């Protein structure tokens, strides 16, 4: 079961049909809410420069959404370096603070009244990570590869080293690589066997010293692959 303060973040892009944006996520958002998941936040993934091409009169696409659900909130980790760390740059020339005020008009401890700027801050609601470019490895491919930096950013913000993170759409194994990089424990699912192979091979190519085995039998991936080929040859 998920921890009480577990956070669910889901990336979805735009779809156009008959010259309109299709809000295909509406039914799913309603279903999540009916299951007790709050529509906690809605972020934008800034993918960098717009994609080249003819977009039928629209601006070139350069973003996607990230929907954030939870049952209870958790403060994100401060992972973004502050440009003016250690400086009192939030003070005006005449000495008053530019820190955010509360509803009562007072500047309190949460906004660090009278303190220098911290080393790090919480991430913005716009996630600025360049889209993936190029190949993902030798003799492997996937039609929708995400940059490792995207799940890495989320994992650093909403989990701690040693935490278990769940990826229900394993794809090319991007979240698995991000978990390995950030010292999290990934649990991923992928329904397409061919993409499961891609994810495993991609992980092996990035981490050749880490053994990959089938839990049920202890076989290595190479042994399982060879067994499949033997079965396929026997069926022909």
Segments (PLM) and residue ranges:
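S-adenosyl-L-methionine
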Residues: 200-236
């Amino acid at each position: 079961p998920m921890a009480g303060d577990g956070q669910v973040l889901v990336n979805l892009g735009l779809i156009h049909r008959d010259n309109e944006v299709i809000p295909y996520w509406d039914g799913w958002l309603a279903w999540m809410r009916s299951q007790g998941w709050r529509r906690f936040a809605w972020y934008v993934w800034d993918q960098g420069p717009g994609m080249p091409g003819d977009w039928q009169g629209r601006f070139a696409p350069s973003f996607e959404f990230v929907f954030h659900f939870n049952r209870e909130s958790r403060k994100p980790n401060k992972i973004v370096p502050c440009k003016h760390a250690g400086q009192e740059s939030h003070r005006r020339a005449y000495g008053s603070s530019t820190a955010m005020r509360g509803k009562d008009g007072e500047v309190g401890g949460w906004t660090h009244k009278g303190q220098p700027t911290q080393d790090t801050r919480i991430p913005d609601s716009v996630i600025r990570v360049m889209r993936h470019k190029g190949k993902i490895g030798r003799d492997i491919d996937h039609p929708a590869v995400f940059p490792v930096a995207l799940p890495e950013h989320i994992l650093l913000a909403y989990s701690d080293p040693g935490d278990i993170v769940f990826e229900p759409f394993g794809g090319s194994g991007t979240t698995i690589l991000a978990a390995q990089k950030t010292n999290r424990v990934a649990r991923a699912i992928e329904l397409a066997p061919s993409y499961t192979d891609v994810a495993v091979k991609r992980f092996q190519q990035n981490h050749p010293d880490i053994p990959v085995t089938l839990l049920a039998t202890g076989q290595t991936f190479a042994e399982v692959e060879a067994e499949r080929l033997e079965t396929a040859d026997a069926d022909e």
